[in-house]
Amino acid sequence: VAAFGLCSFLAPALQARLGLCGAASAALALLLLGTALRFIANLAAFAGGMFLLGAGIALLNVLMPVVIKTRWPRRIGMLMGLYTGMIGLSGAVGGLTAAPLFAWGGSLSWPFGFWTAGALLALMVWLLLMQCRTQGQSSESRCSAPKPAEDKERPLGLLRRTLRAPLAWILTGVMGLQSTLIYTAAAWMPSYWRSQGMSFETTGIWIFVFLFSGLPASVMTAKFFKVCPSDRTAGAVLSLLYVLGLAGWLAGGAWLLPASVAAGAAQGAMLSAAFLLMASHTKGGQGMLAVSTLSQGIGYLAAGAGPFIFGRLLQATGGWTAPFVFFTAVIMLWGLCVRLADTHQTVD
């Protein structure tokens, strides 16, 4: 998580040097190198691989929403939904397959190899798309030439100016708080279920259900926000849905399935909502890049504290009540940030 936050701030400089798609290609290469390094039976290589892996993911998290906004401005809702849905799906597949692959192969090389192959495939597909673009794709899908009306201000200068915009910090709260929720849930819900007598494999299944449920929800988030009377109403509904899911998790038994679906749908929609709010409150690609960098850089750094605070509360109180009260408070704070972001103002 620390790598996510710190490396996010490198995105504007990388984009200024390599261009938007070149920067995304470099991030994918880092992702592939990081996954490959984990095969080396050496602690330093493993740690370096994990850092490069986090750096690649962080850069892609910042850059891909900008690619969507600048290259497919008429399809932002659908493509942002698909993008965030795939993020959730990949996490769900990882949670579901890690233990079986390890048990089947008897080594961490099997799950590591699975994701190395995935990173290689992603890089190959991306490079193929870039090659198709150079061979005459439509102007809407092009990824190199800047638009005439694009911001003239340098990315780093715009980022510094964005730091002074109150709305940018509100959007950072929207991104950071939803990140806090998913990291905390993924880190501690399996431990809670294990304390209730659930097997390790079964906890993986429920985490998969939780993350997979976010896929259809994230795709439908743009339409959901349109049918709601206001963004603040949509934020309140998603917050309530997450709280109900959390209550079902704690109840256990027959409530686990509907609770996992409800919490997962809310979580997936929250991430999609964060990107949609960024897009709607920025005018150009450079403004989107600055807000995406700030919200994800600071947001991820703050989100890393979520699992730590949850664990400290568990240790200090000896029970699960205080940690889950903290979790509920984070949900409510997310809804408050969406309410504050319900404005016609833009950051840039």
Describe each region flagged by the PLM.
Residues R74-R75, L82-T134:
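Helix-loop-helix hairpin linking two adjacent transmembrane segments in secondary transporters
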Residues L6-L43:
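Conserved MFS/SLC helix-loop-helix module at the cytosolic interface between two early adjacent transmembrane helices
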Residues P166-F208, G214-A217:
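Extracytoplasmic gate region of multi-pass secondary transporters
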Residues F51-G85:
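Cytoplasmic helix-loop-helix junction between adjacent transmembrane helices
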Residues V1-F9, G91-A92, L211-V219, A303-G304:
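Residue-level signature of mid-helix packing/kink "hotspots" within the transmembrane helices
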Residues G285-G319, F327:
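A late C-terminal transmembrane helix in Major Facilitator Superfamily
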Residues C7-G19, A217-S230:
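Helix-to-loop junctions at the C-terminal end of transmembrane segments
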Residues P229-L277:
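C-terminal transmembrane helical hairpin of 12-TM major facilitator-type secondary transporters
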